[in-house]
């Protein structure tokens, strides 16, 4: 190996060590003039605010509590429904509004009221789930309707076959009701569907379905897990919901901050005045962010809040 190559390799190793141990700065100093004092913080749940056991680290709660004391709006921004927002987060004084089901529903959490929505017509949702049923691959699929998850009885006990994390399996099962045939239930009882979830055991099957769904312009397809796809109505994304909520509250985009780790957080990271990715985030999110903080297992949300908000 040439000396120059060795030096480059050493530099790469050093960079990896810094990324592992430190908060990684991606030039935020160059953008200080482009955003104002933070007045709204939107934070993803899974892989971001909560740890791998689906608990909110105390350090994160205390940091958000300190932000709320300064009058900053704390906004859960999640693929979960309103019911899936952790109770201890809802209890914080600065938490009133939520961006849920990937931006399909923006809600007033205190008054249990929908502020804006962008949902799938039930007929389109039935078409998509029928496509999954008939695709020939081992796919598990369900849907959220008015904040409640519905799945077929044949799927309910199969989550451990698709998801390795016991904590995530418990969370997913607690958010769903089993009915004999949820496609039939939606056809007969629903006008709109908040979001469709699909789970795959095979990556090739997942990519085949993503390609098919990508040919339907009325859909927005994203993902928060390596084994899933999340299907929303076109126009339902966290970034658009963040801007709509900020406008509703009279807050400039430049005064917003957003945290995320997954593909379904990408629009929000791009739209926020200050986008912060987690160290455990997917490459596209870390590339889009102005700043990369510590992982969800290291209370990375609190670390970035201390650096930029609680200075």
Regions picked out by a protein language model, each given a short descriptive name:
Residues 131, 138-259:
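Conserved acidic, metal-coordinating active-site core of Asp-based
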Residues 54-70, 117-124, 179-183, 235-247, ...:
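Short, acidic loop-to-helix structural element flanking the phosphoryl-transfer center
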Residues 35-40, 56-57, 214, 230-311:
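Mg2+-dependent phosphoryl-transfer enzymes with acidic/Ser/Thr/Gly-rich catalytic loops
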């Amino acid at each position: 190996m040439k000396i120059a190559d060795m030096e480059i390799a050493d530099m790469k190793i050093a960079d990896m060590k810094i990324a592992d141990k430190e908060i990684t700065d991606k030039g935020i100093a160059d953008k200080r003039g482009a955003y104002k004092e933070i007045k709204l913080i939107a934070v993803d749940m899974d892989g971001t605010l909560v740890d791998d056991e689906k608990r909110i680290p105390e350090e994160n709660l205390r940091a958000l509590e300190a932000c709320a004391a300064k009058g900053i709006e704390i906004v859960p921004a999640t693929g979960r429904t309103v019911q899936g927002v952790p109770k201890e987060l809802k209890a914080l004084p600065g938490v009133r509004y939520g961006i849920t089901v990937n931006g399909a529903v923006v809600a007033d959490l205190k008054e249990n009221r929908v502020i804006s929505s962008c949902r799938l017509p039930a007929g389109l949702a039935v078409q998509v789930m029928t496509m999954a049923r008939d695709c020939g691959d081992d796919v598990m699929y369900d849907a959220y309707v008015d904040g409640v998850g519905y799945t077929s009885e044949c799927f309910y006990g199969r989550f451990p076959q698709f998801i390795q994390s016991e904590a995530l399996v418990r969370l997913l099962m607690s958010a769903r009701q089993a009915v004999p045939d949820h496609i039939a239930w939606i056809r007969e009882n629903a006008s709109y569907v908040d979001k469709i979830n699909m789970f795959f055991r095979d990556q090739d099957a997942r990519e085949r379905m993503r390609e098919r769904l990508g040919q339907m312009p009325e859909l927005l397809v994203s993902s928060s897990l390596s084994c899933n796809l999340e299907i929303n109505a076109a126009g339902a994304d966290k970034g658009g919901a963040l801007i709509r909520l900020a406008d509703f509250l009279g807050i400039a985009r430049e005064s917003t901050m957003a945290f995320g780790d997954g593909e379904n957080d990408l629009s929000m990271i791009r739209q926020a005045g200050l986008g912060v990715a987690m160290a455990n985030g997917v490459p596209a999110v870390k590339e889009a962010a102005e700043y990369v903080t510590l992982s969800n297992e290291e209370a990375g949300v609190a670390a970035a809040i201390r650096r930029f908000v609680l200075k």
